[in-house]
């Protein structure tokens, strides 16, 4: 008997097929995407309203009462603002949500996404340092952008430099 491993030609490996009659579940409807987007945007807009009141010099208790949130939420926003310019930066996800909510046109969203200075995920020791390109992948997976839109953005980003892994 020969103990040499057999060379596998991947073309010979059969690809499993779904059971006969099976169809994938339908994606979310535009109405469902809109509802989810509105809920997510409400949180973002509230965070930015809290930031504006902090910049205007309001104290935490007054902001909490005005916004209907716990004082601890205001403190978290204030602490993030001390270490970063904003606690709630604009992201590719937000642009997708704004389009789904009807707050932004298809053209405006795509113009912004085409010119976005993307960063890409990398492995850092035993963790993943996510980049904002992951937001675009998420938007596609959840149905917020079409295959065609994703393909156009991917073609733009294919030539962009990727961050090296740190192992």
Residue spans for each PLM region:
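Acidic, Ser/Pro/Thr-rich low-complexity regulatory regions
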Residues: 2-167
């Amino acid at each position: 008997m020969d103990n040499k491993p057999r060379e596998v030609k991947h073309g010979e490996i059969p690809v499993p097929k779904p059971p006969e009659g099976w169809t994938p579940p339908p994606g979310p409807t535009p109405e469902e995407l809109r509802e989810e987007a509105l809920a997510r945007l409400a949180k973002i807009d509230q965070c930015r309203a809290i930031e504006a009141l902090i910049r205007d010099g309001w104290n935490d208790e007054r902001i909490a009462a005005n916004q209907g949130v716990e004082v601890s939420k205001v403190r978290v926003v204030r602490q993030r603002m001390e270490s970063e310019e904003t606690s709630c930066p604009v992201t590719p996800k937000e642009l997708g949500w704004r389009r789904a909510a009807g707050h932004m046109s298809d053209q405006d969203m795509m113009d912004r996404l085409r010119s976005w200075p993307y960063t890409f995920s990398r492995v850092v020791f035993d963790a993943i340092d996510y980049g904002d390109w992951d937001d675009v992948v998420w938007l596609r997976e959840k149905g917020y952008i079409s295959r065609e839109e994703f393909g156009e953005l991917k073609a733009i980003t294919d030539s962009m430099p990727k961050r090296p892994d740190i192992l």
